[in-house]
Amino acid sequence: MLKVGLPLGACARSWKSVRMASCGMARRNPLDNKVALVTASTDGIGFAIARRLAQDGAHVVVSSRKQQNVDRAVATLKGEGLSVTGTVCHVGKAEDRERLVATAVKLHGGVDILISNAAVSPFFGSLMDVPEEVWDKILDVNVKATALLTKAVVPEMAKRGGGSIVIVSSIAAYSPFPSLGPYNVSKTALLGLTKNLALELAESNVRVNCLAPGLIRTSFSRVLWEDPARQESIKATFQIKRIGKPEECAGIVSFLCSEDASYITGETVVVAGGSLSHL
């Protein structure tokens, strides 16, 4: 008797394809042709986010305060076959924010995604010893610039029918890091900014969410993990007893920018190994 059909291996592959399509797994590029701006994206968490967004199909504009850092990041990501350009941007300067948005519009026709990641933390010590100019600098860059860059980018998102914004806060918003008082306060402020922006921008179909990373191994957080005793003290508060990796933040951000998160706004996702995350 002649038996007609697919070989067993082919049947298995066909069935796997059906299952992947049924649950949305067949969509290889969830951010296909989206245009994304990522601030402070030449190193650490920002760089990992830029890479992941580009891997997921977005055209990404990376930025940093130094041209050599921008050039290095762009060269690295282009070397991986990703669609990436870059420009210098100090988010505390209005002209730099304007140039960042203009670069995306000129090269790609608009903006769909903003990742607000830039932050400074120039002080380590008692909150009672913080000079006024340090307060001004931290709040200017970490909070005010985030709001003003959002203001600059929303009209471009509206032209394209909406968009997604992810603000990068920190677990320090919930559980303050010792001796980093002004930074902790600024990151708590971003939780409130996220809620307010989400409320106001919903009518423009712009979603606003927040990422709160825990202790992630980056140059920015080195002061917290380079000393073994301090590192062990901090890790003792984690349920997952290790320092996180930038890539463990990037996937969450890509999800929040995708259609899979189309009914999520005003929320903060904590990526912190089980650290306490309640105000």
From Swiss-Prot:
Q: Which GO terms describe its molecular function?
A: all-trans-retinol dehydrogenase (NADP+) activity; carbonyl reductase (NADPH) activity; identical protein binding
Q: Which Gene3D superfamilies match?
A: NAD(P)-binding Rossmann-like Domain (3.40.50.720)
Positions where Phosphoserine occurs in the chain: 221
The feature of type site (Responsible for the stereoselective reduction of 3-ketosteroids into 3alpha-hydroxysteroids and benzil into S-benzoin) is located at: 177, 180
Motif Peroxisomal targeting signal: list the residue ranges.
277-279
Q: Which GO terms describe its cellular component?
A: mitochondrion; peroxisome
Binding residues for NADP(+), per the UniProt record? 37-61, 187
Which Pfam families does the annotation name? adh_short_C2
Q: Does the keyword Acetylation apply?
A: yes
Q: Which PROSITE patterns match?
A: ADH_SHORT
Identification of the protein by name: Dehydrogenase/reductase SDR family member 4
Instruction: Please name the source species.
Output: Bos taurus
